[in-house]
Amino acid sequence: MNLNSIPAFDDNYIWVLNDEAGRCLIVDPGDAEPVLNAIAANNWQPEAIFLTHHHHDHVGGVKELVKKFPQIVVYGPQETQDKGTTRVVKDGEIAFVLGHEFSVIATPGHTLGHICYFSKPYLFCGDTLFSGGCGRLFEGTPSQMYQSLKKLSALPDDTLVCCAHEYTLSNMKFALSILPHDLSINDYYRKVKELRAKNQITLPVILKNERQINVFLRTEDIDLINVINEETLLQQPEERFAWLRSKKDRF
C-alpha cells in the first residue's frame, strides 16, 4: 500500500491509499479537483471514500467524485448521510477496503459523530488528533474529546497518524508556551519549523513520537501537572485537558 497526501484549500490534506494494481481509497475529499488531477496523473481506480465527519472541507468533493466514478462506496458516520455517504458505519465496525480491514473508532469531540479509521499502521483521524494538538470542540465536550484522544493514544507505537490539516507549527508554538524547557518539544519544534520554511509537509507522524510532544496526550505527565498547578489545582486528567483546550482556544 502506498500513502499519498493531496493538499487542498489553505491547509487541508486529502489522504489517498493505493495498492499495486492502482485501486485507491480517498479520505475526506473536501475538494474534488485536486483529487481528480491526482487520479488522472497516477492512473488510479477509486474504490472507496472514507469520511470522518460532516464539515464541508472534508466532504465538499464527494458528490463530484461519485458522479465521475459511480462505483465508489462512500463510508461515513451517521452525520454524513446527507453528504453523499452510501454506507453508514459506527464504532467497532469493520470496513473492508482494498483487501484490508479498517476498524471504525468513534471519536466525538470536534463533532458529535466524528469517527476515525485504523488499519495498521494507518490512522485516518480527521480533525480529532493533530500533530502537537487536537481539534476544536465545535459540538462535543472536553470530556468526550479527552476520551477520544485516549483511545487513539492507545493504538500501537508505530501507528502512522494521518491528520487532515497542516497545523503542526502553530500547535508546537502553543506547546512551547506551556512547556518551554521540554527537550522533545523544542527538538520537534525546530524540525517542524525547518520543514515549513521549505513548504514541506509535516505529516504523517509516528504515534510513539506524538505522545512525547503533544501536550494534549500528556495530561498525566508530571511536568505538565506542575505547570497547571501553578495556576489552578486540577485533580483529574479530563480537567487538565479542558484547561489546555481553553488555553489553546485563546492562544
Swiss-Prot record:
Under catalytic activity, the entry for this protein gives: an S-(2-hydroxyacyl)glutathione + H2O = a 2-hydroxy carboxylate + glutathione + H(+)
Classification via InterPro entries = Clx_II_MBL, Glyoxalase_II_hydrolase, HAGH_C, Hydroxyacylglutathione_Hdrlase, Metallo-B-lactamas, RibonucZ/Hydroxyglut_hydro
Which of the seven top EC classes does this enzyme belong to? hydrolase
Give the family per the record.
Belongs to the metallo-beta-lactamase superfamily. Glyoxalase II family.
Q: What is this protein called?
A: Hydroxyacylglutathione hydrolase
* Residues at which Zn(2+) 1 binds: 53, 55, 110, 127
UniProt xrefs under CDD domains: hydroxyacylglutathione_hydrolase_MBL-fold
Residues the entry annotates as binding Zn(2+) 2:
57-58, 127, 165
Give the record's pathway: Secondary metabolite metabolism; methylglyoxal degradation; (R)-lactate from methylglyoxal: step 2/2
Q: Keywords in alphabetical order, please.
A: Hydrolase, Metal-binding, Zinc
What is the role of the protein in this entry?
Thiolesterase that catalyzes the hydrolysis of S-D-lactoyl-glutathione to form glutathione and D-lactic acid.
